Amino acid sequence: MNQLEALKQFTVVVADSGDIDSIRQFSPQDATTNPSLILKAATLPQYQPLFDDAIAYANLQGGSPETRLINASDRLAVNIGAEVLKSIPGRISTEVDARLSFDRGMCVAKARKLIGMYQEKDIPRSRILIKLAATWEGIRAAEELEKEGINCNLTLLFSFAQARACAEAGVFLISPFVGRIYDWYQEKQPTSDYQAESDPGVISVRDIYDYYKRHRYQTVIMGASFRKVEQILALAGCDRLTISPALLEQLKNSSDPVERQLTPSTEAFHPPSPLSEAEFRWEHHQDAMAVDKLAEGIRLFAADQQKLEALLAAKL
């Protein structure tokens, strides 16, 4: 048994890719996309028909150049998501434009629109996760969407305050970013050679996992943004892990043993009172890494969204 097969005994494996060929190769349960992955996929020749369809769809809908661009971008994300769903049994995560991260109402409206576009393709909402940045506004939007039966994946999660607020809002799933946390500490302390057990990103997910299980929160924890296989193996037993094709390949090519590292607590505690907005902002801002990385993540996703729109605008 290879490490990928062994890991699947403890953890739901998710492909962090929009590349259908890669996804088919590793048989994941689910897949996640983001603006960076959609941008990458949009330039692949096999996706040209999906790109062309997005342009045709936007032109058919009409409206101002800005409206057509937004519709083309949304349609392309849904086209790629729908294509990926043909190769997996579970769900696809499709991301709301990062530029809406501080506007609760716009996040809700965009999520409903994306779900509607999937439904036009006869894909039920039960196969979609709407990805939202784990800002206070994004978490509140997710709380509202969950009540409508639209499940959400709260991404760019770096602080314990974000994780706690997501659980208290009853969101379906969170994506704590292991690798980006690791990157920040490596940059600040370049001489540190973090082993898996002392890796700040790994420790962050373990702490969230223990807290959720002790308080019996139903929110799924999906570790994300891995830099190396050791980080993945250190989180064997986490509810889900979303892994890039390159690291899935490494796991598939190794037969070293995989041991479960995370197990749910048998103890149960009453959850504390939910964080207020002021408490959330204070707690989150006590973590310099989380403040830096959330802001950077939103900027990077927004920049890739703009690059994608430039590709689309050239064809509209």
Curated annotation (Swiss-Prot):
Reaction(s) the record says it catalyses: D-sedoheptulose 7-phosphate + D-glyceraldehyde 3-phosphate = D-erythrose 4-phosphate + beta-D-fructose 6-phosphate
Keyword Transferase on entry: yes
Quaternary structure annotation from Swiss-Prot or TrEMBL: Homodimer.
Entry's Gene Ontology cellular component terms: cytosol
Key words of the record: Cytoplasm, Pentose shunt, Schiff base, Transferase
Protein name: Transaldolase 1
EC number: 2.2.1.2
Any one Gene Ontology BP term: carbohydrate metabolic process
Localisation per UniProt entry: Cytoplasm
Residues annotated as catalytic: 131 (schiff-base intermediate with substrate)
Pfam family, one: TAL_FSA
Family in the record: Belongs to the transaldolase family. Type 1 subfamily.
GO MF annotations, alphabetized: transaldolase activity
